[in-house]
Amino acid sequence: MSNAKSYKDTVNLPQTDFDMRANASKREPEIQKFWQDEQIYEKLAQNNPKELFILHDGPPYANGSLHIGHALNKILKDIINKYKLLQGYKVRYVPGWDCHGLPIELKVLQSLKSSEKEGLTPVKLRQKAHDFALQTQKEQCEGFKRYGVWGDWENPYLTLQPEYEAAQIAVFGKMALKGYIYRGLKPVHWSPSSQTALAEAELEYPEGHTSRSVYVAFPITSVSTPVLRPFLPNLSVAIWTTTPWTLPGNLAVALNPELNYSVVETSESNYLIVATDLVEKLADTFNRTLTIKATVKGLELEHTKYRHPLFDRESAILIGGDYVTTDSGTGLVHTAPGHGQEDYIVGQRYGLPILSPVDDKGNFTAEAGQFAGLNVLKDANEAIILALTEKGALLKEEAYQHKYPYDWRTKKPTIFRATEQWFASVEGFRELALEAIDSVRWIPATGKNRITSMVSERSDWCISRQRSWGVPIPVFYDEETNEPLLTEETINHVQAIFGVKGSNAWWELSVEELLPPSYRNNGRSYRKGMDTMDVWFDSGSSWNAVANARPELSYPADMYLEGSDQHRGWFQSSLLTSVAANGIAPYKTVLTHGFVLDEQGRKMSKSLGNVIDPNVIINGGKDQKKEPAYGVDVIRLWVSSVDYTNDVNIGQNILKQLVDIRNKIRNTARFLLGSLNDFDPVKDAVAYEDLPEIDRYMLHRISEVFTEVTAAFESFQFFRFFQTVQNFCVVDLSNFYIDIAKDRLYISDPNSFRRRSCQTVYAIALENLAKAIAPVLSHLAEDIWQFLPYKTPYLSVFESGWLNIDPAWNNRELADKWAKFRQLRTEVNKVMETARNDKAIGASLEAKVLLYVPDESLQQELELFNNCDSLTGNKVDELRYLFLSSQVELVSDISAIQTAEYKGESDFVSVGIVKAEGEKCDRCWNYSTQVGKFADDPTICERCNAALKGEF
């Protein structure tokens, strides 16, 4: 056969310059440059036909490098924005940064030499903090752009911008004028390590905090009920506390009026008052017998007096709230109005003074008597416990592990301490806030319960901070009376100054310049307050400074999207300020995501060595073999693959799987591109009604798949998109349609109906695949679009709009029929595989398939698909092509199957595999009895002979 012709050049093999390898670290930046040069985002944001869609960015903190949590957050936002752009909305995304606050101030202070710290004025410190925040913002901005995130990067919002600070003062002013801002001496979370008040959102509760808890006896001096009189003078009330250092601030004991309390004998003629329900438990704790001598209702004990064991003062037993329970302790609660929220409320009700003998550093003041100078978090507990022991008042000391608030930045414990602070009176607008929560769509729905309970139960919001790097509270104090001056006129004047000069003006200008003219010579002398605002008030004002201020945006925003910790952070501060100022929520929809953990579900930490750096995923690590450069599309694909409503996992194994999936999608697209290299939809497309049945079935699948993809994006369930697209590329395209269609594409005449009909479906599948993956695999989608071998009216995939699905493609009847055919194919493949494994056949084309189908209607359907003459009919809808075999025979008797060496059966078909009849065709590799019958081409079959003449 040495003279045999070569038919290699007559076969239509796929041709494309689209690279098999992603080469993402090089290709992605090229695509990003194309987007930037062509202003794709800007044009769509301006020219799209539908209304505005505003996802308002929660500002990341301008401190430190980007981590995988940033990537999750920003990419989720970008997926939604790009989907909305493809849907035709005018999407305007303004990225923001949170630039004030303690963490930046601490970073700056840590970076200074001791010589630089001397003479460091607030103005100099603020300048350094400003420069640090801007530098970090620039670095983070470049990182976000490399993630492929689209937005107005040239005009971001920064909370340190003068116009932002002025808008923040406007929010504060509106709240103040409505009576929602007040100054008060109240217990707040105080951080001795940072020497400032903290908001709830600035606290964390690490595992494993252990306190020295004590049970203490306070001797009773006078009784409110005669039932107690017989036990005097040896009667005491027992309390329990996990913070012995707060005992110098004790001014009451609180009880629950509904509970029963008993007098118990502890030893001969010594008695304690405790909750009746706890007697047994306390007997174990004290390791002694407690005998009940009398029992009274809590209400009857009100106004019973006791003497403080360490200070010469009398206090009373008072009625507390439902926080007094029998879950722990004694059922009677030590109450220090200067050291606790509930204590403060009880104290206010009974007119108690607010005693808080602790200074900014956490040291006892002279009011603490013998304990003055001791630090409450270090040596005070030991000294107080010793003093209680000496007085015979200590009943028991034991270690107690519980959740305790720490400063989120210094990682050191905080205390409750009463100080003069500025507050937002949440009580004044709580009901309005709860109504506003009801008007919002929460995703997942559990977010609504979370923020509702937080807002329902929260205390007033302490908004003042004793630090330099922030927006000052625009208040003046009368030098003589210390009365605060806060009027519409003073607020507006400061706001106008900040709008031009920024908040630095507060430190740089004199009081006279900061005051409006009418207050400059009114016979009073003023000083300016030096407190700054809580940074949550900064970011919580962004709805006014950005969404409401920029003409291209809108308020309320369509969506806020952040981590689930923001229910107590930005979601809440934004809600409270917007409701207080305007009576409405600042957002219509709130979507929350969980935190990123490693593959074992552990938090990431340097000590565990399990930190996944997005930069390393994109560009590769030092050792590129161990940590190859995957590009950002792999991170974006990961974001779409996880159920973000819970905490999510990432690690090397997960990334490798995602790279495989990205490559499968890429290679599927590459094959489709190559197969369309000579196709022009305008000239060559086949009308739907003329398509072979398998092609119409494939369009039905395309319609099903992409309808599901749209539903996934609409409901923000991106994991459904991920699963659907992955399944479509592998199961529907690669393993089924592409597999079957190769014969049509390769060996038919280039212009034949048989080939053009298939290319018609390929083009539809490819264009819709590119559009569907564009919100997620943005770079791959654009790469595909740029390599389309035919012209489209669209420069970018993002200009082409969302999926193009014709309702006519949906054909349930056809789908049911082909579902059976695909099942049949699976059964045939099982038997083929056995024959292949036994080396009885090599390729499936070496086989002839025997089918016995007992169901008559199915048998009839199959007969229509088993044309004995391959040159008649539509030359596509045939069983031999479905099974990739050379021949198929429908047998009327199962015995024909039973004699076959390779066979199998299911509940609806029996399959036999035998050797194909005839010779192998040199061109298409099918076996045919016609090979050798054509004088000019003796080594090819009748199909190839016809194809070379342009007839097949």
Curated annotation (Swiss-Prot):
CDD domains recorded for this chain? Anticodon_Ia_Ile_BEm, IleRS_core
Q: What class of enzyme is it?
A: ligase
What EC number is given for this enzyme?
6.1.1.5
**Free-text comment on the cofactor:** Binds 1 zinc ion per subunit.
Cellular component GO terms, alphabetical: cytoplasm
As its record notes, the protein acts as a catalyst of: tRNA(Ile) + L-isoleucine + ATP = L-isoleucyl-tRNA(Ile) + AMP + diphosphate
By its UniProt entry, which InterPro entries does this protein fall under?
aa-tRNA-synth_I_CS (IPR001412), aa-tRNA-synth_Ia (IPR002300), Anticodon_Ile_BEm (IPR033708), Ile-tRNA-ligase (IPR002301), Ile-tRNA-ligase_type1 (IPR023585), Ile-tRNA_ligase (IPR050081), M/V/L/I-tRNA-synth_anticd-bd (IPR013155), Rossmann-like_a/b/a_fold (IPR014729)
**Keyword flag ATP-binding:** yes
Residues reported in the UniProt entry to bind L-isoleucyl-5'-AMP:
E562
The cofactors it requires, by name, are:
Zn(2+)
Q: Keywords for this entry?
A: Aminoacyl-tRNA synthetase, ATP-binding, Cytoplasm, Ligase, Metal-binding, Nucleotide-binding, Protein biosynthesis, Zinc
Q: Where in the cell is it found?
A: Cytoplasm
What the entry lists under PROSITE patterns is as follows: AA_TRNA_LIGASE_I (PS00178)
Pinpoint motif 'HIGH' region by residue range. Answer: 60-70
Q: Which GO terms describe its molecular function?
A: aminoacyl-tRNA deacylase activity; ATP binding; isoleucine-tRNA ligase activity; tRNA binding; zinc ion binding
Where does motif 'KMSKS' region map?
603-607
Which residues make up the binding site for Zn(2+)? Answer: C921, C924, C941, C944
- Looking at the record's lineage, which domain of life comes first? Bacteria
Record-annotated residues binding ATP?
A: K606
Swiss-Prot/TrEMBL GO biological process terms: isoleucyl-tRNA aminoacylation
Subunit-structure text: Monomer.
Q: What is known of its domains?
A: IleRS has two distinct active sites: one for aminoacylation and one for editing. The misactivated valine is translocated from the active site to the editing site, which sterically excludes the correctly activated isoleucine. The single editing site contains two valyl binding pockets, one specific for each substrate (Val-AMP or Val-tRNA(Ile)).
Its biological purpose is as follows: Catalyzes the attachment of isoleucine to tRNA(Ile). As IleRS can inadvertently accommodate and process structurally similar amino acids such as valine, to avoid such errors it has two additional distinct tRNA(Ile)-dependent editing activities. One activity is designated as 'pretransfer' editing and involves the hydrolysis of activated Val-AMP. The other activity is designated 'posttransfer' editing and involves deacylation of mischarged Val-tRNA(Ile).
Query: What does the similarity note say?
Result: Belongs to the class-I aminoacyl-tRNA synthetase family. IleS type 1 subfamily.
For this entry, the protein name equals Isoleucine--tRNA ligase
Task: Kindly list the organism's lineage.
Answer: Bacteria, Bacillati, Cyanobacteriota, Cyanophyceae, Oscillatoriophycideae
